[in-house]
UniProtKB/Swiss-Prot annotation:
The keyword Magnesium does not apply. Residues 342-556 are annotated as: Linker. Belongs to the ClpA/ClpB family. This is Chaperone protein ClpB. Residues 5-70 are annotated as: Repeat 1. It comes from Bifidobacterium longum (strain NCC 2705). ATP 2 binds at residues 616-623. The gene is clpB. It holds the Pfam family Clp_N. It is found in: Cytoplasm. It comes from the Bacteria. PROSITE patterns: CLP_R, CLPAB_1, CLPAB_2. The Clp repeat (R) domain probably functions as a substrate-discriminating domain, recruiting aggregated proteins to the ClpB hexamer and/or stabilizing bound proteins. The NBD2 domain is responsible for oligomerization, whereas the NBD1 domain stabilizes the hexamer probably in an ATP-dependent manner. The movement of the coiled-coil domain is essential for ClpB ability to rescue proteins from an aggregated state, probably by pulling apart large aggregated proteins, which are bound between the coiled-coils motifs of adjacent ClpB subunits in the functional hexamer. Gene3D superfamilies: 1.10.8.60, Clp, N-terminal domain, P-loop containing nucleotide triphosphate hydrolases.
Length: 889
């Protein structure tokens, strides 16, 4: 018998046997089967009962109550319960129903009708009490099935397959659920033109992710609803097919094909009234294919060629090339419609069209300056994504951020709330104390607590009033949006009386109320501008600064308005860098000017912020200036992309910068330069010892220096427009340290060496070639302070103070001076004379936490260190006394 049952019918009977056995019932009754049918996920029984006029929940509750009342055997029984006489009769009736309906398998609806028709049984009585009879169930079957027949064991899965696996876009457009589509008229007209063809009427929308391919289809749905289409498309139904849900849960071989076939049959039987849309159309290639079975693409081909299926597809250029173009037989059935990225001006128009929807959703006001900022800033700073998607995301997130702030208590209220809690806890403790001091403190505390509570109460009242105003405006906008949708619906249906009632009665009333609420907000804003004390606790308007904050969060690029403090910092940038890098004013000025141009917004938007070649002998501060710049911009000198060019001496090492080509090891890993900049687009990039690299490296950098972009091994474009590129080199350093040459001769000799090593097209693209001069003996004194400060900083955890006398500083500067090697010999000298001696004293226990260490030079070959602990000096030099320390200090 089970051979004639569908899979779901077999599962229902199996579940009924299990539940009867678990409950200790001697027989399997119709109640058990009825309960199993109602509990089935994606089952037909509940839908059929609803269609027949019954309440599945009420019937299910009655069935469960009846099951509890069934007699159960005590003790455990190993025998399986048998079908009762009533259940046997119901199954026999179900088989008769199957034959009468012309089906090939007994399905769950046959079982349900069989139970209702084979009276007397308890399940039939429950159904009848709830207004469901065998006749009403039979009448409801065609509607639930969608006209399908039971011709396979998985038939229930194909009932109303189109409704189950698709979304009706025209219905969504009628209900106003789709966002308005601004522009894209040319693309929509082209789609309509292709759909109007007799054969091969299948447009496929191709474009980069985020340019608005799906929006074109939504725009078509809105035009169909509005009647703004040719007669060939008027009244048509546009549905979006979900291949993912069709594949999901298809456990058995052929189940996916069965579902797709059911959908295609429903579309075919609609006689051209249905237009199908498949987003990510490339997924049809290979979908459902396993062990030789056909994929969705091959099943669609015949209908696509004959024009029986009008299909709109959407996919990206890469996916179309990789999947659709590989199958010429499938590709020729589609007509391509290219959807390009809109311009910044078009994006602003799109954002203005969407503004009302986002204002109604977030219940905030979105200023026009925010829309312009979203389009322009996203176009300039967010690479790797397309307009208008990235601009819409910026506005959406900025509005969501503001809404979150509006729904949270302001910081002032939080602080006062915490203060009240703290004072209340202290009050409880003081009330228990009896001493006079505690009582006096209690009186003062209670006065402070009363004052704080009063302040908190006033702030809360003000906050509640502000929130009420914000919410009123938001609610009115949402209501206005709903009324417009209703008016459009009544107009389409021809119900002009209701439409005019909304258009000329309710909408003007809401608009008047909204205008009054908005003007009240505007007056409040003007008052707060005149008197900062009246400023709103949280603003309710998304402006350009709000959008700039989101851009900064996404990219790390500071694109917000320059604050007064930052203005001062940028104007005195040379002073800050000059504290770290001694004696190189020309280089510091060149870098500072580049940063100021960028932050003021007047640098060339298509080139890097700055590109410099630093020339000079070793140890004069070339690399240190790059570190200082990273520290100035990011408060962290490690926030710098450092490429040691000595590692790129071979020709093959070029691929390490931008990533290996396809087919080579390391292709998936990306390049060391491109990946670092892609993750941190606002950074200082240092190419250290650039003359040691293979000459072919510079051919790769030409595009970066000129256009601010570089394509990596995987074909992705990496944006370098917000980076500062610094290259350091020792070329010609022998001329710079030659004291017999004058300044002009030195410069000419160095530039000749540079021109011999680098190509003209590389040098011509640099913003500036900066020469670092050898350090003088006087400048080395400043570097002594920096090096000693570094040692002192490392001792702060142990609270050890380093006190260096003037004689020690002078000795370090004189001994460590070597114009050919710069500041590095001085660093080594400080390490050996101060660091090494201090380490020995620490290990010997001569220096303890909290001590002061005196560094002095009294004429010997080395510096002398003395530890000042309490009232005595612990020293390696017996000649140094407390008096000497006092005198030196």
């Amino acid at each position: 018998m089970e051979q004639k049952f569908t899979t779901m019918a077999q599962e229902a009977v199996g579940d009924a046997i299990q539940s009867a056995s678990a409950a200790g019932n001697a027989q399997v009754e119709t109640l058990h089967v009825m309960d199993a049918l109602l509990r089935q996920e994606n089952g037909v029984a509940r839908s059929l009962i609803e269609a027949a006029g019954g309440d599945p929940q009420a019937i299910g509750a009655a069935v469960r109550n009846a099951l509890v009342a069934l007699p159960s055997a005590s003790g455990s029984s190993t025998s399986q319960p048998q079908a009762s006489r009533q259940l046997t009769a119901a199954i026999a009736q179900a088989e008769k129903e199957m034959q009468q309906m012309g089906d090939e398998y007994v399905s769950t609806e046959h079982l349900l009708i069989g139970i209702a028709a084979s009276k007397p049984n308890q399940s039939a009585e429950i159904l009848e009490k709830n207004g469901v009879t065998a006749a009403s169930l039979r009448k409801a079957v065609p509607g639930v099935r969608g006209g399908a027949k039971v011709t396979s064991p998985d038939a229930e899965g194909s009932y109303k397959a189109l409704e189950k696996y698709s979304t009706d876009l025209t219905a969504a457009a009628k209900e106003g659920k789709l966002d308005p589509v601004i522009g894209r008229d040319q693309e929509i007209r082209r789609v309509i033109q292709i759909l109007s063809r007799r054969t091969k009427n299948n447009p496929v929308l191709i474009g980069e992710p985020g340019v608005g391919k799906t929006a074109v289809v939504e725009g078509l749905a809105q035009r169909i609803v509005a009647g703004d289409v040719p007669t060939t498309l008027q009244g048509k139904k546009l549905i979006s097919l979900d291949l993912g849900s069709m594949v999901a849960g298809s456990k058995y071989r052929g189940e996916f094909e069965e579902r797709l076939k059911s959908v295609l049959n429903e579309i075919k039987n609609a006689d051209g009234q249905i237009i199908t849309f498949i987003d990510e159309i490339h997924t049809i290639v290979g979908a459902g294919a396993a062990e030789g079975s056909m994929d969705a693409g091959n099943m669609l081909k015949p209908m696509l060629a004959r024009g029986e299926l009008r299909l709109i597809g959407a996919t990206t250029l890469d996916e179309y090339r990789e999947n659709i173009e590989k199958d010429p037989a499938l590709e020729r059935r589609f007509q391509q419609v290219f959807v390009g990225e809109p311009s910044v001006e078009d994006t602003i128009a799109i954002l203005r069209g969407l503004k009302q929807r986002y204002e109604a959703h977030h219940k905030v006001t979105i200023g026009d300056d925010a829309l312009v900022a979203a389009a322009t800033l996203s176009n300039r700073y967010i690479s790797g994504r397309q307009l208008p998607d990235k601009a819409i995301d910026l506005v959406d997130e900025a509005a969501a951020h503001l809404r979150m702030e509006l729904d949270s208590s302001p910081e002032e209220i939080d602080e006062l709330q915490r203060k009240v809690t703290r004072l209340e806890m202290e009050e409880m403790q003081l009330k228990k104390a009896e001493d006079p001091a505690s009582k006096e403190r209690l009186g003062k505390l209670q006065a402070e607590l009363a004052d704080t509570r009063e302040k908190l109460s006033g702030l809360k009242a003000r906050w509640d009033a502000e929130q009420a105003g914000h919410n009123k405006v938001g609610d009115l906008r949402a209501k206005l949006d709903d009324l417009r949708v209703q008016a459009d619906k009544y107009t389409r249906e021809g119900n002009l009386a209701e439409a005019s009632k909304i258009l000329y009665g309710e909408i003007p009333s809401i608009q008047k109320e909204l205008a009054a609420a908005e003007s009240a907000d505007a007056e409040s804003a003007d008052a707060s501008a005149a008197n900062p004390a009246d400023e709103p606790m949280v603003p309710d308007r998304v402006d350009a600064d709000s959008v700039a904050e989101i851009v900064s969060d996404w990219t790390g690029i500071p694109v917000g308005r320059l604050m007064q403090g930052e203005n001062e910092k940028l104007l005195h940038m040379e002073d800050y860098l000059g504290k770290r890098v001694i004696g190189q004013k020309e280089a510091i000025a060149a870098v500072s000017d580049a940063v100021r141009r960028s932050r003021a917004g007047i640098s060339d938007p298509n080139r890097p912020t700055g590109s410099f070649l630093f020339l000079g002998p070793t140890g004069v501060g070339k690399t240190e200036l790059a570190k200082a710049l990273a520290d100035f911009l990011f408060d962290d000198e490690k926030a710098m992309v450092r490429i040691d060019m000595s590692e790129y001496m071979e020709k093959a090492s070029v691929s390490r910068l931008i990533g290996a080509a396809p087919g080579y090891v390391g292709y998936e890993q990306g390049g060391q330069l491109t990946e670092a900049v892609r993750r941190r687009p606002y950074s200082v990039v240092l190419f250290d010892e650039v003359e040691k690299a293979n000459p072919e490296i510079f051919d790769v950098l030409l595009q970066v220096l000129d256009d601010g972009r570089l394509t990596d091994g995987q074909g992705r474009t990496v944006d370098f427009k917000n980076t500062i590129l610094i290259m350091t080199s020792n070329l010609g350093s022998q001329f710079l340290v030659n004291e017999d040459m004058d300044a002009d001769a030195k410069k000419k000799a160095v530039m000749d060496a540079v021109h011999m090593n680098f190509k003209p097209e590389f040098l011509n693209r640099l913003d500036d070639i900066v020469m670092f001069h050898p350090l003088t003996r006087e400048e080395l004194g400043g570097i002594v302070d920096i090096q000693v400060a570094g040692v002192s900083q490392r001792l702060t955890d142990r609270r050890i103070t380093l006190d260096v006398t003037d004689s020690a500083r002078e000795w370090l500067a004189n001994t460590g001076y070597d114009p050919a090697y710069g500041a590095r010999p001085l660093r080594r000298l400080v390490q050996t004379e101060v660091g090494d001696q201090l380490a020995r004293m620490l290990l010997a226990g001569k220096v303890h936490d909290g001590d002061t260490v005196l560094v002095d030079q009294t004429g010997g070959e080395h510096l002398e260190l003395s530890a000042w602990a309490s009232d005595q000096i612990v020293s390696d030099n017996p000649d140094v006394s407390v008096d000497n320390v006092t005198e030196d200090k």
